[in-house]
């Protein structure tokens, strides 16, 4: 078992753009993730790589970087920032950090709410 639990849920942005929501949760007793955890980490099966991926969860920067790289074959990859949302509960913005799609560009902020299924 990995020290980082990954859960994927099909979802859409507030504008209706479909994507895969990748929720990351550290599951160690101390709440601390070590770099060695990356060696046993696997992206969940069933990802729809023709859609974008939003990575969300409390993570060290190096772990988020690893997940961005691991998801690079997706149409686009974004990271979630709750400070970029609106007054809706669970809202935030997903900042696009990599793209192969004409529909989004690096630096775009996609408004979304965290799916209930990952809470």
What are the language-model segments listed below?
Residues 58-62:
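Acidic, metal-coordinating catalytic cores used for nucleic-acid/nucleotide bond scission
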Residues 52-57:
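Short glycine-rich phosphate-binding loop at a beta-alpha junction
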Residues 1-50, 63-119:
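Long, low-complexity, Lys/Arg-enriched
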């Amino acid at each position: 078992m990995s020290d980082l639990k990954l859960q994927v849920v099909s979802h859409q942005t507030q504008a209706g753009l479909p994507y895969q929501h990748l929720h990351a949760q550290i599951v160690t007793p101390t709440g601390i993730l070590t770099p060695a955890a990356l060696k046993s980490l696997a992206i969940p099966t069933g990802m729809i790589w023709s859609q974008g991926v939003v990575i969300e969860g409390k993570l060290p920067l190096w772990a988020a970087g690893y997940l961005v790289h691991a998801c690079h074959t997706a149409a686009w990859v974004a990271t979630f920032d709750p400070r970029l949302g609106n007054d809706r509960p669970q809202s935030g913005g997903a900042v696009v950090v990599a793209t192969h799609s004409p529909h989004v560009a690096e630096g775009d902020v996609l408004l979304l709410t965290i799916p209930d299924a990952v809470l």
